[in-house]
Amino acid sequence: MKVDTLEESRISDIGHAFGYYDYGSEHGLIDAFPSRDAAAAFICGYVRMALLGGLLHTTSEKGEAYIAYKRPGEKLRLKAVLPLAKGLLGSMSFGDLMRFARIMAKGEPGLDKRFDKEKKPYLFVGMVCVRESYQGQGYMRKVLKLAYDEADRLGVPVILETDAQSKCDKYIHLGMELAGTRRFGEHGVLYDLIKYPSAPRRSESSSRRDQE
């Protein structure tokens, strides 16, 4: 279901789930931020942007899990982008911001940029979050299905990027394919993932005709 309004406490829950994700021995691009709180504040800004842009969806009214995705051709208005800029600028000093920019500049263009260059349509997933109290209960599969079903309806692939091998493995388990990796020096790796649209389900009458 599409999310039109969201309490600040729920936005904070999402930010905390991202900012305090357990990377284990991995670095993750969380290292590009000056602190875990700064990463959480940036994600909160992203959630507000997705909310204003009409990109945010959830599994149910309980809000167990959230996903933000952009369909082919959808554009964000400046008003929607401002919360993301505020979240980024408000969470870092000028020096931290310059360091963040230098780290992000080390990576190659992502799969979405390659699709843009080739003028290929796709559905881009910018955020997937299962709130911490609902993790380990199958909600990641349920929330991803929202994007998968919409992409199948449109006949386009789903594209997503993540910054940890542990996350990448979960997405592959849930139907995505690893399309490539991008290294950001010693600060981590981004994994580009894709799920191609499922073949349309054939009707029983069509199957019977094929057998005649």
Identify the meaning behind each predicted range.
Residues F33-L56:
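Active-site rim helix/loop that mediates acceptor-substrate recognition in acyltransferases
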Residues Y122-L123, E150-D163:
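Conserved GNAT acetyl-CoA-binding A-motif
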